[in-house]
Amino acid sequence: MSSTRALLAAVLAAVAAISASVASAAYPERPIKLIVPWAAGGDTDVIYRTFAPLMQKELGGTIVVANVGGASGTKGAREAKDAPADGYTIFAVHDSIHSTYYTGVADVNYSDFEPICLVTSTPSIVTASPKTPWKDMKSLIADAKKKPGQITVGATLGSTSHFFPAMVEQAAGLKFKYVSYEGTAPRMNALLGGHIDLAESNLTQKGKADAGQLKFLAIASDKRHPEVPDVPTLKELGIDVEYAVNRGLLAPKGTPADVLAKLRSACTAAAKDPGFPGQMKKHGTLVRFLDHNGYTGFLRKNDALNKDLAKELGMLKR
């Protein structure tokens, strides 16, 4: 009797394995949800609404962008982590997955996922409301030193938009007052309306800066950017800060290897599409493709860097 049960168990296991293999071979059979853990209209949302159709061409299936905002990106991260590991949920991520984890805002980290690929990198810019009196970064610094804790900075607390000004604070010996916003779009609307003084932004806002609706004070790249040659780097102003927001794709831990291979192949094809760099340039970002092997090492290194930054900034909670 026991041998019969053992044989039956073996047969059932074999059938399950064959069924899983067939299902993976047919992947994708239904739409794939791409979770963007911030509000619609923000940088990550815009980038992946451009990128998803390029991935679709390679996959032969539909990718639907789903904005799951809240709790500094944590709500969407948790939903992605807890989704079935079947390839029908993928996660749009950037460096905040490290910063929110180490500042105690989130309980989800990059190690809860499988890497697909790194897609873009966007240098950060110190950006001021047009209603502020500062003509340049030097005048901001001088004013901030006269009134510590009075200049307001919009940020998603614990995220990259918080880490960047905190690094500037520390390097320049300043003290800002932070106002929390869930995502880029509401933060930039507050800045445009003069409800806050400063925020981290990037070249997606160049049109508004050119129109006088915002003021670019300094960029956090290693050298001046050709798109904004008159904007100095923080380093040339004596503020030793370089910072960029790096965006990639992850899948839930345990996603089948053959499904991951298809997602990675589609990500590679999309990132190498000849029209993609030009599309990203319009959105103020650079294509920075790394395959899953390169991205794995990048995530590991970036995680350690963010932990160190959280410690240096007095924000480490883990």
Where are these regions (language model features)?
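Bacterial N-terminal signal peptides that target proteins for export
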Residues: M1-V11
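Bacterial N-terminal signal peptides
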Residues: A9-S19
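An extracytoplasmic/periplasmic, membrane-proximal ligand-sensing/linker region
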Residues: E29-P31, A171-F176, A257-R318
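C-terminal lobe and pocket-closing loops
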Residues: S121, Q205-K272, K301-A304, R318
